[in-house]
Amino acid sequence: MILGIGLFFNACEKPKETLETTQEQATLENLNILMNNGEKLIINQRNTQDKNHNFKNIEPKKANVLQDLLVTSDKKNIKLLFFFTTWCEPCVAILSHLENLQKQFGDEIGIYGIAIDDLVGETENFQESVEVFIQENQYFLPLAYGKNREELFSALGGIDGIPLIVLYDEKGEYIIHYLGAIPEEMMEFDLSQSVAKMRTK
């Protein structure tokens, strides 16, 4: 139990100036995020006054920004965005949980990794670091570490910690997100509910 509580709040943090973008935040419109397996996410951003946000262990302001995104692809499934860096131990620790969830739910969910080392100041040998990360951790899920990530990072106003996991439904609507190495059971519960709703539509 104590270990579980520790993992819930365990997240990699960097100084505020490296995690937060200093660029002017522009509204995203049809931003294409290309994955290393050829899959593509299309991200749009909208302004909303809706205050009924659903977030866990993260400040409301960030939840508002994430809820304003519409994340779609050519697949009608639940999408899980996994923001991470290659040096973050909690990020590595959560990989096995993500792989378990992908196997459990199959094509009804899509898990997309988004590496941000270079966006938080770790620019040296970024491509090589990602390739080593893939090999050492036998990472097989779709992964983005190319162009256009910076625009998404800027629209988010930076990221407060990692791993950051965000769920969107089959229509691209925000569901929920988590900060830190959270228990697999929590993600499984939320995914089960979302998949069940998707099946009834």
Question: What kind of feature is each model-predicted range?
Answer:
Residues 109-125, 139-149:
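Thiol-based oxidoreductase modules, predominantly thioredoxin-like and allied folds used
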Residues 43, 52-79:
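A short beta-strand-turn-helix
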Residues 77-78, 93-116, 135, 184:
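Conserved helix-turn-beta segment immediately C-terminal to the redox Cys motif
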Residues 161, 167-201:
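Thiol-/selenol-based redox modules, centered on thioredoxin-like
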Residues 128-164:
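Short, internal strand/loop/helix patches
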Residues 83-100, 121-122:
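Conserved redox-active cysteine motifs that mediate thiol-disulfide chemistry
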